[in-house]
Structure formats: structure tokens, C-alpha cells
């Protein structure tokens, strides 16, 4: 099976403090890969390095078969969708209008908007203003924005944080179905093992910046 993400000795230090220490991992194509670890383990920093949002102190990132560098970073990220912070959107606009803005920024045809709304189960609420949405609906809208343009890779940093139990369950179901419904490989972080068991096919456990286990979950 081909790999969508590979890292080699990926390291991030701030002064004398090592946040991520020689991280070497492999995310197989077509998987939902769970990045599991307690708060402060280095999950978010690792994801930001994968996206080039944080510059690594050492090591390499390989995305979609290419070692990422300044020359190819933008081209690789055009094939990658992400939700790293809380989803952003204009609260006074509808979900569809928000997606039209993102589609224009990405250079994506507006015909793709209907597809992503169906994937995240927001088609019936597409013409409501985002200010009327629950947190779970806003999270799903954020994923819809990330899915515009049919990325090969989707990176999600703790997307169930702050959701009520019903919202958490809906989000888990949505993420577990992503490879089948969108063709995307998914990298998702969480600090909850029980949550991972409901979503992922592969898991990497991170503790104090080090990968201590990687392999199939079941």
C-alpha cells in the first residue's frame, strides 16, 4: 500500500525545549490514521509541520510521494485539506455563501459545493446563516471547506473538541466514512482512545513528543 504521509526524524525545538522528537511515521493511502496522545504531546505541532505552518528544526516531511520543500509546498498543499484551528466563517452569511468564497479563493468550480455539502450532511441547512449553526454544524462546515477541490489528504486536529455527545457521534461517523465517500486519506488527532476506536484504521501514539507505537488499531 502506498503512503500519503511519511516523516523522517521530524523534530521541533523551541530553545532548549523539544516539542516533537525524531518523529518517523507512515500514513497509508486510503486510511483513517489516528494521531493519539494527551494534551501537550506534540500532535498539533506535528500537524502544523506537515502543512508547513511551523518550520521544523530537523527531519523531513514527505507528502503524496514528494519531499516537501519551499518550491513544491504550495502545489502539495493544493491537494491537501485541513482543519487545524476552530473553523472560520462569516456568521452573517449562509453556509453556501461561505463555501462560494472559499471555492473562489481555491479556484474551485462552484459545482463542487453541492458535493461537499452532501458529504458533510449539511445540504438541507445550506441556506441558513452560519450564526444559526451549532458548534457541530460549524465543524462540519469547516470540513466541507477543506474538502473543496477533492483533496487527496485531509488533516483534522481534534475536530470533536467541545461538541455535545450527539455532535461527537455524528462527527466520528462522518470521518470514518471519508475514504469511501471522498477518496481522501484522513489524519486525525485526538486524546481519547475510545473515540479513535470508532473511527480509525491505523493509530500512532505520541507521548512527550515521541512516537511510542504505530500500527493497525484492530
Where are the predicted features?
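ABC transporter nucleotide-binding domains
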Residues: 2-7, 12-207, 211-213
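Short acidic-hydrophobic catalytic motif
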Residues: 218
